């Protein structure tokens, strides 16, 4: 596994991380992988690590999507980028107070339970602060891959920031994600 130590899985946010974010997307035909996603996932799998998707889908609670539409989009993501070993989806809204919606750690903990591994054996890659907060709360390693919707304070607060999904996977497989803050490929001064 070269440099991954006790890492056994990499979990990913869906929208804005693995696929181009289409707000409240219920149409599988609109699913487009992020640049480099296919190759990045292949590297993770070749390293012998499990993969999974952890995604907030509040469009269900808001009445903008059905559970079936979310499942249909997820099937398309799996066709293009999978197979994934585990899927966790939160259909709740921000005010619902559930334990699964990121930044709560519930979905990451559930994914780890399904995989039979400890959260500490997992890395989580996402594009917003709630992703990093969920991973941290679960005890997993977090990597932020900023997009235009990522706020500067979320970038500043993240311990590890990768320039894109491929770079995130390089950091994870290189075993450096617990050791450095990497911004745009440059190590932060000690």
Ranges and model annotations:
Residues 2-52:
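Active-site neighborhood of HAD-like aspartate-dependent phosphohydrolases
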Residues 37, 41-74, 83-96, 135:
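Substrate-recognition element of Asp-dependent hydrolases with the DxDx(T/V) motif
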């Amino acid at each position: 596994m070269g440099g991954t130590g006790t890492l056994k899985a990499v979990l990913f946010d869906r929208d804005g991380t693995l696929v181009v974010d289409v707000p409240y997307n219920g149409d599988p035909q609109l699913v487009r992988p992020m640049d480099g996603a296919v190759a990045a996932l292949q590297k993770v799998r070749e390293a012998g690590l499990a993969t999974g998707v952890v995604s907030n889908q509040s469009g269900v609670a808001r009445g903008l999507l059905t559970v079936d539409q979310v499942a249909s989009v997820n099937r398309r993501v799996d066709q293009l980028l999978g197979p994934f070993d585990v899927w966790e989806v939160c259909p709740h809204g921000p005010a619902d107070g559930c334990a699964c919606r990121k930044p709560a750690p519930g979905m990451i903990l559930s994914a780890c339970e399904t995989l039979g591994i400890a959260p500490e054996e997992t890395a989580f890659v996402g594009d917003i602060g709630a992703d990093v907060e969920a991973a941290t709360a679960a005890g997993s390693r977090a990597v932020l891959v900023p997009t235009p919707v990522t706020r500067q304070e979320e970038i500043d607060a993240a311990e590890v920031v990768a320039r894109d999904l491929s770079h995130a996977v390089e950091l994870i497989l290189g075993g450096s994600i617990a050791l450095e803050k990497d911004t745009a490929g440059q190590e932060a001064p000690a």
